[in-house]
């Protein structure tokens, strides 16, 4: 978090004050309980975590390491979502389904992705490694590796093979090298 968020000056800041960090660590407990087939307790705790932090992560979701929820308020991560390592997600993001379908129905977010504030990624689609999703975009189709997607509905507006969006946190969409 310290390398990505200029507001974090001390290593202790996330541990003490950042609810995104707290929500992810709390999720890890509920995920463990879910895997131990203690699903009722996992769902109960997840509900309490959602109330406390305004972050709703289903205990069955799979979340890697190096994840940053910046500001965190209003983040929703559905049951079959997968978030790989080193992903940055800003406030108001939803990784959701598209309706009442059952089974594997939520997005798969690959390594190094940055998802801008208010973005909605819906359905069992993949967002490729080091992709960038623009603020308030609605993503309904897969996004290739290193691509930038923005708009409603989202479309590919650029590609940058050198980008590391989860780390540089650059939300500027000008000069995308197309």
Label the model's feature ranges.
Residues 1-49, 164-178:
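Terminal amphipathic alpha-helical/low-complexity segments used for targeting or macromolecular assembly
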Residues 50-157:
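Structural signal for interior beta-strand "rungs" in well-ordered beta-sheet cores
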């Amino acid at each position: 978090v310290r390398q990505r968020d200029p507001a974090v000056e001390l290593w202790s800041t996330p541990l003490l004050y950042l609810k995104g960090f707290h929500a992810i660590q709390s999720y890890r407990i509920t995920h463990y309980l879910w895997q131990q087939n203690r699903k009722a307790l996992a769902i109960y705790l997840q509900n309490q975590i959602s109330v406390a932090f305004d972050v709703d992560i289903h205990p069955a979701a799979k979340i890697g390491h190096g994840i940053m929820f910046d500001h965190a308020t209003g983040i929703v991560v559905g049951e079959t979502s997968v978030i790989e390592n080193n992903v940055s997600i800003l406030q108001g993001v939803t990784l959701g389904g598209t309706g009442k379908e059952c089974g594997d129905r939520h997005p798969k977010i690959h390594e190094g992705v940055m998802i801008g504030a208010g973005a909605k990624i819906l359905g069992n689609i993949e967002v490729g490694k080091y992709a960038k999703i623009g603020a308030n975009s609605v993503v309904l189709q897969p996004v290739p590796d290193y691509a930038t997607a923005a708009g409603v509905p989202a479309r590919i507006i650029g590609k940058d093979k050198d980008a590391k969006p989860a780390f540089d946190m650059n939300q500027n969409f000008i000069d995308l090298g197309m």
